[in-house]
Amino acid sequence: MMGDLTTSFPATTLTTNEQPHVVVCSGAGMGHLIPFLNLASTLSSAPYRCKVTLLIVIPLITDAESHHISSFFSSHPTIHRLDFHVNLPAPKPNVDPFFLRYKSISDSAHRLPVHLSTLAPPISAVFSDFLFTQGLNTTLPHLPNYTFTTTSARFFTLMSYVPHLAKSSSSSPVEIPGLEPFPTDNIPPPFFNPDHIFTSFTISNANYLSLSKGIIVNTFDSFEPETLSALNSGDSLPDLPPVIPIGPLNELEHNKQEELLPWLDQQPEKSVLYVSFGNRTAMSSDQILELGMGLERSDCRFIWVVKTSKIDKDDKSELRKLFGEELYVKLSEKGKLVKWVNQTEILGHTAVGGFLSHCGWNSVMEAARRGVPILAWPQHGDQRENAWVVEKAGLGVWEREWSSGIQVAIVEKVKMIMGNNDLRNSAVRVGEEAKRACDVGGSSATALMNIIGSLKR
């Protein structure tokens, strides 16, 4: 069966004027879905004008995924939807449900050729999540597969190095030629355990990255210059294909206007702190209360997205009960407590002057695009290395120690980031560089145009 599949997709030769047909294969969870929706939208629009098929992994886990996918296809009628069903294992105690889904996708990727064989016109290339790397690169070796990583170039380097990392101890920083060392505190502990579910599918896919046509990253040249240079020089990981920055990707426009915009319109410029820890970071009730008391004492206006569960369907908390009546009233007098916002609209408003963030990579790129300074409070996964990138690039500061306690530290850190003109100017510079990269003729826009152009030769 595998032998037949590998010959079913010969490389497609197009004339200069033909429209390439590309398949975009997203992974799981909002952190993976959002950049893939942005990529699909970008590829289908001018100046790239590809015919796009967007592969959606079924079943979905969160309500947010369902909502975004439905909205996306309503606003992009020319993009074809292709569902790819995987079998989810039964929930396991103390195992992240997203890890289970990631593994099911990785284990099912070898079945993709059967689904792709139904598509017309012939496929010119695939842009796929890291989770599909082994399955696509072994079953469709003649079809160009661009692996799209949804994290920073620096953390992607670490993921690519996991096959070696899992054999080592965690006692000393990880050194990869051409790059600053990776402190062990920044590395997810599972990476040192080859038997961990997350590490096992990371190793399986990392071992086949060399067969990808290229690695595309939602970053830009001036944001991670040392990492990109080291990867493309061949000094760091010599078996990798070209690593191509194409970000920050254009973001989707939402039909529904953010309900908090009228409130923001009434606030002074750069006076509001936006607080969000992403779609998968659920804080404990004690952490939430400590942060709430700190924000109340900081005397700063804010918008805070409060999340108490990794999966939105499971979040049944009532904010008034969570904070208690007295603290809830005090917080509501100074800011807004919500469970969801349109983050890009919030960050783009002139009243927003800072972002207390977990440093998920989508959030970092959205802040970079708008020049909003970040106070980094990474929680898990890639976030500590992303915070390292944020600080090095001049977009924000990473306060590594909260020794005085969350409540006291929040007061200090919030006042620092909201009143630091040097940091604000540096973040504005990053925003200008991001805009130049994705404008016509910029480094990221040109890189993506070159990829599409190569499909026509």
Curated annotation (Swiss-Prot):
- Record flagged with keyword Secreted: no
For molecular function, the Gene Ontology terms on record are: 2-hydroxyflavanone C-glucosyltransferase activity; UDP-glucosyltransferase activity
Q: Which UniProt keywords apply?
A: Glycosyltransferase, Transferase
Report the EC number(s), separated by commas if there are several: 2.4.1.360
Temperature-activity note from the record: Optimum temperature is 50-55 degrees Celsius.
Active-site residues from the entry: 32, 129
| Pfam families noted in UniProt | UDPGT
Tell me which tissues or organs this protein is expressed in: Expressed in cotyledons. Not detected in flowers, leaves, roots and hypocotyls.
Q: Where, by residue number, does the polypeptide cross the bilayer?
A: none
Q: What class of enzyme is it?
A: transferase
Q: Where is this region: UDP?
A: 279-280
List ligand-binding residues for an anthocyanidin: 32, 381
Q: Which PANTHER family does the record associate with it?
A: GLYCOSYLTRANSFERASE, UDP-GLYCOSYLTRANSFERASE 708D1-LIKE
- Protein name in UniProt: UDP-glycosyltransferase 708C2
Q: Native species of this protein?
A: Fagopyrum esculentum (Common buckwheat)
Report the gene name.
UGT708C2
